[in-house]
């Protein structure tokens, strides 16, 4: 029986290690620690291994920002692609290990013997890049597109039509070796000529990585006017649209960075410059049909976005240790956004041919509780609504604190101020209430409700009393309780009961939490209690003899496309119920605004519509 063998250098030897592959950096880090101890200070001027670690950190952060416009391929990067390209940094690991062996050998000069800058070394590197690296990569790349080499090696790199910056590193060991030789040839020549420098090492490697990432970013960053004014530049630098044609058609545009070699080799795609111009002018720009308007929660979660850490944002938010050293940088961005910023696009996906986007107001959770910031936040939300209206967006759904009752009356402020809005503004809380209510077992006769006089609490109480379920409403305000009770039909008002202490619920096993509970307050719940909740942030589960529900959420339909970002702490494909409520509002084509108080009579209608469109409870 014949045994199929994998092609040489087609898989990574440390693949079985999983995340433990980063232990391979151990000897390099150990060398730096040893030199640090010997010298009594950070060996910045004497340790190549330290420079390798610094380069590793800088290379791993090479990334480009998404923009609303200028996307080359309209498709999004979904979870399947992210998982497939998860180990994009294998090439960086390999290059770091090879470099560590070279720099610790006697052949390589010590950093103390090198100048910080040598212009002649830079000139040599440029000449060697054009004369050696570019043609070598071009012909190697063309060879990789031949039958057996393509199927055994290069086809993996072409797995997806929509590329991202990290796709640049998603290669086999053979391709990685080719790229390493191509990238390092100019450095080797400059050092052999005696004109190497520290700046050349940093500058060349980071510029090489940046240009590779730029090409794969799928975002056009060079103006077509640059090529119109200086036509010769078309042959000296490629563009993301240029590379996208290669990934799409696979028979042209093979160059590394310089289209000149495609022109000389007869493989330059004639559509390259026209496509670049169209993308730059925004001709392929598409107006979103639905927008979910969020805000930043806190400094750490601000890094949970695809244009900062694609891998982290593809998983439910958690405080990863790798994010903590970057906290000062994220804090700096928060300060910058406080003074000069505007609403920006976070992510997008497609559902049944319609484009859905998530926009973010550049404000953090704590800022919503600063009285002096209220006016500015409302102005930002208002500008986002007006921009969406001008663009032709059909529905805009407000998330979390953007629809805070004290801030803007759940969106009522904007609808009243702009009565002619074409975009429908919704808070999505009708579906949020429906999700919570449908979690409650049918045999429950009594519930305990905190946050009872809030917008959601009111709707939940009025709905349950109509089902003849006794609702213990925790509130100190008799006036607010009476106002809600009077809204209920006379025959059901008896089922709404005001309580002022948690002790009143010590025999009730169904708690609906709309206000944060401390461990002491949770103690009053009897054993076996289930905590349903609509409080943000979710309560911490201190009781081991009780169960805790998650925030109201729904799973998007299975035919969603291009979804590659988790919504805060939600799982993959799961969104907050208010987000789902906006989606349902759009899919149904409802023409009313959903702002202010929740219409209890519409809860069942919205729930049934959500199920009809393929959304399911998460």
UniProtKB/Swiss-Prot annotation:
EC nos: 4.1.99.5
Enzyme class: lyase
Organism: Oryza sativa subsp. japonica
The protein, known as: Very-long-chain aldehyde decarbonylase GL1-3
InterPro entries per record: CER1-like_C, Fatty_acid_hydroxylase, NAD(P)-bd_dom_sf, Sterol_Desaturase_Related
Keywords: Endoplasmic reticulum, Lyase, Membrane, NADP, Transmembrane, Transmembrane helix
Family per record: Belongs to the sterol desaturase family.
Quaternary structure and partners: Homodimer.
Species classification: Eukaryota, Viridiplantae, Streptophyta, Embryophyta, Tracheophyta
Gene: GL1-3
């Amino acid at each position: 029986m014949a045994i199929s063998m994998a092609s040489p250098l087609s898989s990574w030897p440390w693949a079985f290690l999983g995340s433990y592959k980063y232990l391979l950096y151990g000897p390099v880090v150990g060398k730096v620690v040893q030199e640090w101890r010997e010298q009594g200070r950070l060996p910045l001027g004497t340790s190549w291994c330290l420079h390798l670690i610094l380069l590793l950190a800088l290379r791993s952060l090479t990334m480009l920002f998404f923009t609303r416009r200028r996307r080359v391929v309209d498709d999004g990067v979904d979870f399947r692609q992210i998982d497939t390209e998860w180990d994009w940094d294998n090439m960086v690991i390999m290059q770091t290990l090879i470099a560590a062996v070279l720099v610790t050998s006697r052949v390589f000069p010590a950093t103390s013997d090198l100048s910080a800058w040598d212009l002649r070394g830079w000139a040599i590197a440029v000449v060697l890049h054009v004369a050696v690296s570019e043609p070598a990569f071009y012909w190697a790349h063309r060879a990789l597109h031949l039958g057996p080499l393509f199927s055994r090696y290069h086809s993996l790199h072409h797995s997806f039509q929509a590329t991202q910056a990290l796709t640049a590193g998603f290669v086999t060991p053979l391709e990685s070796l080719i790229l390493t030789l191509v990238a390092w040839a100019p450095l080797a020549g400059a050092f052999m000529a005696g004109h190497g420098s520290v700046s050349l090492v940093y500058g060349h490697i980071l510029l090489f990585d940046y240009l590779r990432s730029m090409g794969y970013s799928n975002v056009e960053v060079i103006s077509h006017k640059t090529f119109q004014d200086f036509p010769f530049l078309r042959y000296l630098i490629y563009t993301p649209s240029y590379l996208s044609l290669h990934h799409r058609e696979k028979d042209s545009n093979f160059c590394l960075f310089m289209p000149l070699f495609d022109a000389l080799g007869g493989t330059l795609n004639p559509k390259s410059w026209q496509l670049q111009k169209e993308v730059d002018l925004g001709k392929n720009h598409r107006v979103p049909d639905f927008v979910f308007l969020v805000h930043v929660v806190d400094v750490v979660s601000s890094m949970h976005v695809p244009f900062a850490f694609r891998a982290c944002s593809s998983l439910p938010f958690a405080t990863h240790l790798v994010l903590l050293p970057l906290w000062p940088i994220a804090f700096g961005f928060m300060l910058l956004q406080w003074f000069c910023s505007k609403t920006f696009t976070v992510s997008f996906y497609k559902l049944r041919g319609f484009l859905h986007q998530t926009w973010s107001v550049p404000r953090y959770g704590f800022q919503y509780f600063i009285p002096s910031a209220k006016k500015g936040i409302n102005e930002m939300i208002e500008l986002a609504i007006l921009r969406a209206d001008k663009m032709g967006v059909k529905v805009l759904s407000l998330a979390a604190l953007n629809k805070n009752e004290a801030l803007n009356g759940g969106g009522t402020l904007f609808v009243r101020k702009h009565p002619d809005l074409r975009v429908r503004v919704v808070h999505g809380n009708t579906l949020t209430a429906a999700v919570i209510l449908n979690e409650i077992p049918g045999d429950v006769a009594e519930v305990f409700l905190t946050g009872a006089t809030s917008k959601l609490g009111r709707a939940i109480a009025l709905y349950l009393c109509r089902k003849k379920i006794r609702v213990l409403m925790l509130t100190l305000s008799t006036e607010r309780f009476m106002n809600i009770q009077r809204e209920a039909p006379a025959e059901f008002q008896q089922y709404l009961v005001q309580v002022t202490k948690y002790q009143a619920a010590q025999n009730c096993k169904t708690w609906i939490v709309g206000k944060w509970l401390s461990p002491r307050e949770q103690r009053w719940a009897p054993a076996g209690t289930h905590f349903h909740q609509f409080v943000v942030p979710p309560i911490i589960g201190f009781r081991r003899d009780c169960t805790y529900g998650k925030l109201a959420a729904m799973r998007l339909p299975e035919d969603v496309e291009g979804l590659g970002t988790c919504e805060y702490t939600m799982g993959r494909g799961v969104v907050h119920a208010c987000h789902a409520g906006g989606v349902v509002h759009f899919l149904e084509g409802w023409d009313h605004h959903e702002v202010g108080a929740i219409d209890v009579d519409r809860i069942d209608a919205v729930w049934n519509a959500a199920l009809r469109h393929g959304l399911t409870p998460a």
